[in-house]
C-alpha cells in the first residue's frame, strides 16, 4: 500500500511539472525545456512565476559551457520583453550579483539558509536572464584550461553563441523585444555584445534577427583615462581627502596613459599622493557606496555560529548580503535545485573568479566609438550612475556621455533636471537626441538596485517601456 501511495505521488509530480512546463497555449513542443525547470529553491517563498536554470554548451569540443538562470516576469510573461543582465569584474557572477543581491526576485536570508522576496525585483517589468560569463565565472566552465585566458572579444563572441543557442531552448523569445543591461565592467561587455548582435543582424537579410531594443549600463567603465581621475575628484568633493592632496593628484598625475593593470608612467609625487589617499580613506569605507557601513566577516560568522541572523543593516541595506549569498549558493541542495555544478568543479562557488587570466589591457579600450555605432543604429542607450559610488563615479560617466552626444551632433532633448520616484527626487537626468540618456540615482551604490531598489525599478521600467523619467514635480512642500 505504501509503495502504491508513493507511485501515485511520483505520477502526480510528473504531471504537475509537465503542465507547468507547457507553453502558454498549452503546447509542450513550443514550451520551455523541462529539464531546466527549477521547481523550487531551498527556503524559497511561494511564487507564481517560473524559474529555469542550466547550461548552454558554447563549444562542445573544448567542453566550454555557460550557466544561466532565467526568471519569468511576475505577470504577463508572454507579452513582456526579455532582459539579459551581465555583471562586470571582469570575472564576477551575474547569478550571485544581479540575480541574488540586486534585481532578481529573491535575496538570501540572514542565516544564509533560505530566501526572502525582493519586492522591487525587475521581473515586475521584464523576463530576466542572468548569465555567468565568460567560462570560469561562477558555475560556467571549460574542460580546456586555455579557455580561461580570455578577453573582451572572445567574451562577446561566446555570448552571441549563447544567446542563439538559448533561444533554441526558449524559441518563443526569438521575436520578443530584447534589452541588454549590466553594470561596472559590463560597460565593456554590454556594448560589445550589442555590437556583435547588430553585426549579426546586418548579415541575416530575411532570416532570424535579434529584436534589440535598447541597452542600459550602470556605473560603467567606459574610458579609463576619464573614469580613473573621476575617482579622486569624487574623494575630494566628498571630503575624503584634503584640498592639498586633491590638487596634488590632479596636477601631478597624468591619467592619459593609465592602464587597467599596471601603474601608468606616474611621477614619484603622484605615486606618493595616490598611496596617501588610500591610507587616509582607510579600508573601513565601502568604496562601492561611501554612505554604507562595512560588513565585518568575523562578526558575521560569529552570529551564524550562534545561530543568529548574520544580517547587518545600514541605511536599510543588508551590508552582509554578499557573505549570505556566498554561503547559500554553496549549499549542495541549492546547486542541485539550480542544476548547477554538473561537473563537480574542484572549487567553491565565489562571486568573482580567481581562475581567469583576463586580458586586462582590454580595460583600456574606449567604449565611446562602439556606443556611437549602437546609437547610430537607432538603438537607445541609457547610462545610469549611483551617486554614492567612488569606484566608477558619475563624474566621469556624465562627461563621457556628453562627449558622445557632442560627437553624434545631438541636441539636448530633455534638459538636465531632477526626476521623481514616489514624490521624492530619484536622481537627475539629461537626454540627447531622443536616443542617449544619462541618469543618476540618488543615494545609490555602484550596484544601483542593491541600495536603491525602488528608484532602480522605476528607472528600469521607464527604460524598457521607452518612457522618459518623470520631471514633473510633486505638490509643493508646506510647513
Curated annotation (Swiss-Prot):
Q: Where in the cell is it found?
A: Secreted
Where does the secretion signal sit in this chain?
1-22
Protein EC = 3.4.16.-
Q: What does this protein do?
A: Probable carboxypeptidase.
- The answer to whether the entry has keyword Iron is no
Q: List the disulfide bonds.
A: 92-352, 253-270, 295-320
Q: Which residues are glycosylated?
A: 143, 265, 341, 411
Which tissues carry this protein? Expressed in seedlings.
Spell out the coiled coil positions from the record: none
As recorded in Swiss-Prot or TrEMBL, the protein's gene is named SCPL44
Keyword tags: Carboxypeptidase, Disulfide bond, Glycoprotein, Hydrolase, Protease, Secreted, Signal
What lineage does the source organism belong to? Eukaryota, Viridiplantae, Streptophyta, Embryophyta, Tracheophyta
| GO cellular component terms given for this protein | extracellular region
Query: Which PANTHER family does the annotation name?
Result: SERINE CARBOXYPEPTIDASE-LIKE 44 (PTHR11802:SF465), SERINE PROTEASE FAMILY S10 SERINE CARBOXYPEPTIDASE (PTHR11802)
Protein name (Swiss-Prot/TrEMBL): Serine carboxypeptidase-like 44
State the family it belongs to: Belongs to the peptidase S10 family.
A UniProt-annotated Pfam family: Peptidase_S10
What is any one GO biological process for this UniProt entry? proteolysis
The scientific name of the source species is: Arabidopsis thaliana
